[in-house]
A protein has these predicted regions:
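Polytopic membrane enzymes that build or remodel cell-surface glycoconjugates and lipids
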Residues: 2-515
């Protein structure tokens, strides 16, 4: 070989690096242009409680593994604790920026997973770009509290990437990375318990032998079974909203209809429709074709498409964030099917690929338009939260004294009703906290955020009837337009009971030192 001759391996490596950098750049541009404006908005809803939990965990490390109201998602806490060190602990901009970065990183991981499953560099990049610009995936980018969804997907995609291909043996490094990915999945969200099935799909794709599945599936399955047993023991009645109904069989068809733009994705009122059945039939035909043609990666894509939905079948609602992982599996399946079509019908290869490029472009454009509409909805939601934050700042001194404070909700305003009835983007399902002002933010988390003292926590006293019986404190009443400090009272429990008897919602909070 002369000096002018290129090393083929170097060329392949260089092309791979260029492909990765180009994909990362396109994803970065897409996230910045589409989602970036959200960084300047106030936080919304559950985000304040999760940040409050992370605030306490930064001072009390035992809370790093604790649940938040029976939701055991410690990696959510960890990322928020890291945020507190990277950014100002009470600055929404930092938390939002990290969520946007995570959104982009998951899309890049999806491109890597696509390559691992056999997609070409262009197809893998297209899958990642369609995913990152989709309204089915934007809720976790727009709401800081919902990082657990992309964190779970990132862990599963990492597991796919490190799992050896057919003919490749396990190495110490691969084993370590696979264990880390599985532990990361377990730390992200309870849905991780379906991971043994993903492991089975990966190993079957690698070995094509049912007998070979037993060792890895048994190991991960035992870990998942232990997790389930401990979870049921710790939180025996935590998911009281599970129920049987038509939503159980309607959920998957409705998801698929939305993915194919044959119908709307509705977060509630799930019913079986003709569009859903048609979409189910289309996806089944694609999957059967890929399996008959022995397309590598098909079982893995199907696992991502179906598995995340199984633990939530009994949940009678389906918010946007539930769609992010299944949509990744759907896009991978479509990519594998198109690739198989192109290679099987080589006479029509250019036409098939051209059609795929045009379709992907149209889907990205349509998705981006809906994401921008979603952004406007979140802008309205953030503005409503900012009003409450400004009102709370007017009476924060009344809460800062260290005494129990009775917070009375003496209004029935619903500032998000417009978003619920007529959203500009996809239908949304924000959680309403009826006991808290405007139903927006948990009272303790609200005043802890407004107080913004690193060493101070605002506790919520739920058992105030016994804890505050005969205790001196103060009363703050929230009415339309703001809070009113009614001053000191001699018995917080008695005053709270009086307001409750008048059909008012009450909370009792108290500032306590963290250190």
């Amino acid at each position: 070989m002369t000096e002018l001759e290129a090393d083929p391996r170097s060329n392949i490596l260089w092309r791979s690096v260029v492909a990765v950098l180009a994909t990362a750049a396109l994803i970065g541009v897409a996230v910045t242009l589409l989602h970036g404006p959200v960084a300047s908005l106030a936080l919304t809803g559950d985000s304040y409680q999760w940040i409050q939990h992370a605030h306490a965990a930064a001072h009390q490390p035992s809370l790093l593994l604790a649940d938040l109201d029976t939701f055991l998602r410690p990696s959510n806490t960890w990322t928020l604790v890291v945020d507190r060190f990277l950014w100002s602990g009470f600055d929404a901009r930092g938390y939002r920026t990290t969520s946007l970065i995570l959104h982009g990183l998951v899309a890049l991981a999806l491109a890597f997973a696509g390559r691992r499953l056999g997609l070409g560099p262009v197809a893998a990049a297209a899958v990642a770009l369609v995913w990152v610009t989709s309204p089915f995936t934007d809720e976790s980018a727009f709401v800081v509290a919902y990082r657990f969804q992309p964190l779970l997907l990132f862990a599963w995609l990492a597991l796919i990437v490190v799992w050896p291909r057919s003919g490749v043996s396990w190495s110490g490094g691969r084993v370590t990375l696979a264990i880390v990915a599985i532990l990361a999945a377990a730390a992200s969200k309870e849905t991780w318990v379906v991971t043994p099935v993903l492991v089975a799909a990966l190993e079957f794709d690698r070995r094509r032998s049912l007998r070979a599945l037993a060792p890895p599936v048994a190991l991960v399955g035992m870990a998942a079974a232990l997790y389930i047993a401990l979870y049921i023991f710790a939180f025996p009645t935590s998911k009281s909203y599970y129920e049987l109904g038509s939503h159980v069989i309607a959920r998957v068809p409705q998801q698929l209809a939305a993915f194919l733009y044959l119908g709307e994705s509705r977060p509630y009122g799930l019913t079986v429709t003709s569009a859903g059945l048609l979409a189910l039939g289309v996806v089944v035909l694609m999957a059967v074709a890929c399996l008959r043609w022995r397309v590598s990666g098909t079982w893995v894509a199907l696992s991502l498409l179906v598995l995340p939905t199984l633990p939530t079948l009994l949940v009678p609602f389906m918010p946007q964030r539930y769609l992010a992982i299944p949509y990744a599996g759907f896009l991978l399946l479509v990519g594998l099917w198109i690739g198989a079509l192109a290679s099987r019908f080589q006479r029509w290869q250019k036409a098939i690929r051209g059609f795929a490029v045009v379709t992907a472009t149209l889907v990205m454009v349509a998705g981006a338009a809906i994401v921008r509409a979603d952004l406007e909805d979140y802008r309205v939601m953030a503005a409503a939260h900012q009003v409450l934050l400004d009102e709370a700042a007017e009476v924060v001194d009344a809460v800062a004294g260290g005494r129990p404070v009775l917070i009375v909700r003496d209004e029935r305003a619903q500032p998000l009703v417009e978003i619920l009835r007529e959203p500009r983007g996809m239908a949304k399902l924000p959680f309403t906290r009826h006991q808290d002002p405007y139903g927006l933010i948990d009272s303790a988390a609200l005043f802890e955020w407004v107080l913004s003292e690193e060493g101070t926590r605002v506790d919520r006293i739920d058992d105030w009837a016994s804890v505050c019986d005969g205790s001196e404190g103060s009363v703050v009443v929230h009415r339309d337009g703001g809070f009113a400090d009614l001053g000191v009272i001699s018995d917080v429990a008695a005053e709270a009971a009086r307001w409750e008897s008048e059909q008012r919602h009450v909370r009792v909070v108290q500032t306590v030192p963290l250190d």
